[in-house]
Amino acid sequence: MFSSSVELELFFIFVLVVLNGIFSGSEIAIVSARKVRLEQLAKRGNRKAKLALKLATAPNNFLSAVQIGITLIGILTGAVGGATVALRLAEFLDDIPLLAPYAGPLSISLLVGFITYLSLVVGELVPKRIALSHPEHIACGVAPAMHLVAQLTAPLVYLLGVSTDAVLRLFGITSKEASPITEEEIRVMIEQGAQAGMIDEAEQEMVERVFRLGDRPVKTLMTPRTAIAWLDVESDWEENQQEILDTPYSRFPVGRDSLDECLGFVRVKDILNSQWSGQKINLEEIVQPPLFVAENTRSLHVLEMFRASGTHLALITDEYGGIEGLVTLNDLIEAIVGSIPNDDEIQEPQIIQREDGSYLLDGLLPIDEFKEIFDIETLSNEEEGHYHTLGGFVIESLGKIPQSGDYFVSDTLRVEVVDMDGIRIDKVLVNQLPEDSSTTEEESETDN
């Protein structure tokens, strides 16, 4: 029915569609390939991976070359257009009485529909699906050919680039460099990796904590001054010895009458060495130089200071030079991996979820962890640095040192003080209220 010229024309159209598919698949593969994976392959000596990485790191020229190829293929496909095929198909339809009056338009419509279908399936969808399923492997496979195409079309790409920039300038648009990847984007990628099962939940939590550690001031991790176990050079050795025996620590700050007169810190190891050698214990002789850190120093920076100094303990100072607290290397590690209790330490959890869904929280709970529990973005006066713990948030919200039973409402949370340790907030009960709750902060203050 059809002559050899028709078959040749159909074959030529099919070849053009396949070439279009190669360009489309190559574009998707190189753009979506993970650069980290390509770098790993390139370091192992994979030359194709080096070419793919080169194309991926400078995508503008490569994408322009691909677009030139796809455009030329589209023009050639339209030029060939299957004119001979349409003519032969019209002659075939003329033999059918019912279709004879519409043979010409119908043959063109059928041919256009066939070429469109073939172009979409073979020239676009299938190659892109394949490229997305194995981007790095395919990117390495097509890199040599695409690199050659980019070199051959370089003059035309340059001309098109200059022309495009000129047109954009007419509209007052200037090209900008791609913004670097943000921390939030990394968080999303990690979350997606965890959902896909590629990253363990524990690994995800640790990475999230590392990000938080970079933002948290060291004050949020410190042991407050009132809870510091320290040794006084003016006290009898028996008193200092009992302080060491009563606590599980291996390092102690040393002061003279007060922590504000801090001389440094001593290691229990050095005390034992002096004692076992028969020497009289003199804390001033074995004291190590102290490391002082401002209260608003970022925790991650303190970790770097520990690494540089070889010290595992730092004293936190306020703006007046007074000792406000103490932080150790163990505190920073626990902020990343979670609580690590000592063998002889019975540690009460800071977060307890009760059967009714409410939470019993420690007053010293870092405010970042409180926000994470209830998925809160920001709290009142938090950015001003007025508080860093749940207890500080309660005092800020109530405007006074509370008593047991005092409470307030913040958004949909009812926050109640249930236990005080002197003037320190020990335990706080937090309930999630319904969103349509009519309870207001003003009503709670009236009740109090």
Swiss-Prot record:
InterPro entries: CBS_dom, CBS_dom_sf, CNNM, FAD-bd_PCMH-like_sf, FAD-bd_PCMH_sub2, Ion_transp-like_CBS, Transptr-assoc_dom, UPF0053_domain. Residues 2-203 form the CNNM transmembrane domain. The chain crosses the membrane at residues 11-31, 62-82, 106-126, 142-162. Pfam families: CBS, CNNM, CorC_HlyC. GO terms for molecular function: flavin adenine dinucleotide binding. It is a multi-pass membrane protein. It is found in: Cell membrane. Coiled coil: none annotated. It comes from the Bacteria. GO terms for cellular component: plasma membrane. Its main location: membrane. Residues 222-281, 286-345 form the CBS domain. PANTHER family: UPF0053 PROTEIN YRKA. Belongs to the UPF0053 family. This is UPF0053 protein sll0260.
